[in-house]
Each structure stands twice: as C-alpha cells, then as structure tokens.
Amino acid sequence: MQIPFLHKRKRGKKPSAAAAAARAVDKARYDGTLIARGLTKSYRSRRVVNGVSLVVRRGEAVGLLGPNGAGKTTCFYMITGLVPVDEGSIEINGNDVTTMPMYRRARLGVGYLPQEASIFRGLTVEDNIRAVLEVHDENVDRRESKLNDLLGEFSITHLRKSPAIALSGGERRRLEIARALATDPTFMLLDEPFAGVDPISVADIQALVRHLTSRGIGVLITDHNVRETLGLIDRAYIIHAGEVLTHGRANDIVTNPDVRRLYLGDNFSL
C-alpha cells in the first residue's frame, strides 16, 4: 500500500487564499488517521529503521510485529515520541507531530500505555484517574461525572477506594486504560500489552483492545506474543531488517512465505 505524501510548501512566498483552502481540505482528508511516512533511524553508522511507512485509522487495531532486532521497537518509540526521528514524518489527524514531545502529542489525541506498570502506586484507584482529569478539565462536576463513567465502563467502581498498588495485573491494566481515556485520545499506542501475563489476563487485554476500537479509537500494538496479537488485530505490519517486509490481514501475514521463512517458522498457526 502506498501512502500519499502531502505537498511541501515553498518558503518565502505568502500563501494565497486558494492555497490555504487547499491545505485545509488536505488536512481534513487525513482526519482520523495516524500516518508515519518514511521513518528512518540510525545509531552511529548502523541504520536500524529504513523508510518505514504505516497507517492507523480510527476504530481499527494494527500490529507492528517482527523478530528481535528488526527495528520495530525503535519505530514504535519514534511514533510515541520517545525516540527522535532522523528522517521521515509522523502525522496525527493531519497535524505534523514529528518533532513534538510526548505531552504535545497527547494533547493532539495520542494515548500511550507502556509495558511497565504506570499507575500512581501511592494513590487510590479513583485518584489515579482524577489526577489526570484535573489537568485536562477545570470543571469539577464534569470531572467527577467522567470519573464515575470511566470507573463503571471498566468495571472497577468497586475498587475506587482501593490503593492502586493492591490491584491484580488485570485490574491494573483496566485502571491504566481508563486513566489514559480520561484525555479522550483518538489513538492508543500499546507497548507489549501481553508481556508476562497469564492466559486469563490475555483474554482480558484482548477484550479491552476490542472495547477501545468499538469506541472509535485507533490502536497500534507492538508485542512479541505474535499469536495473541494476530488474533486480535485488523491488520499488521511485519518489520524485518529495519524495513516493512509486508503488511495485511492476519491470514495474509500467516500464509506469506517470506514471513514464515524469516519470522514465524513453518509450524506456526493461529
């Protein structure tokens, strides 16, 4: 799949009204999309990501997969804002966020859930969510209403007064996602959500991701647990040697001979 590139504006000349209108139309065209174009990253003389392009749309779950050392994690971290981009661009809803820090990307609709526990351990469940709401909404009544809605939506109302440190793994993940949704993100970036969890928690996380997409949120997942991820996503990009080897739906990925030879192995099945 080819990703269309936006035309770059020449410097020096003030844009005409027609040109400004054309750019507004072009920006609207990309509303509801997260687009990475030609991402490239080198460390010293080694190029670890070489021209990776991908698209995530609202309401779909997309996997970013590949063998160890393929460059998928570096690519994912460039999209989150944790790693600077050497070449290429990243756009959220038509806004160029390539050089923006994480907090500015968050304001434009990007939520990020790291692999490590990110709860505020010294706070209760409700205060974990309230702390985020206080930053994003000055209206107390509206904050409390949204807090109650999120607690109910993720079935943790009965835990609202519990210390966050006492939660189980599945409860903690529900709290983390509920807290991330307090900012009303358009996209969620999930880093290794299936790492080190038991089978019951795997099913719980899969249900949570499906819930996010049903909300109209686009989800980008990177994970080493291939079977669990492929069983959940709408599409996947397979990264090998720093480049996109192929992309498509799960069945297309699994039956691709290059993917089986270089990544999944001959005996892999969903």
From Swiss-Prot:
Coiled coil: none annotated. ATP binds at residues 66-73. One of its GO terms (molecular function) is ATP binding. GO terms for biological process: transmembrane transport. The keyword Disulfide bond does not apply. SMART domains: AAA (SM00382). Pfam families: ABC_tran. Keywords: ATP-binding, Nucleotide-binding, Transport. Residues 34-266 form the ABC transporter domain. One of its GO terms (cellular component) is ATP-binding cassette (ABC) transporter complex. InterPro entries: AAA+_ATPase, ABC_AA/LPS_Transport, ABC_transporter-like_ATP-bd, ABC_transporter-like_CS, LPS_export_LptB, P-loop_NTPase. Belongs to the ABC transporter superfamily. This is Uncharacterized ABC transporter ATP-binding protein R00382. It comes from Rhizobium meliloti (strain 1021) (Ensifer meliloti).
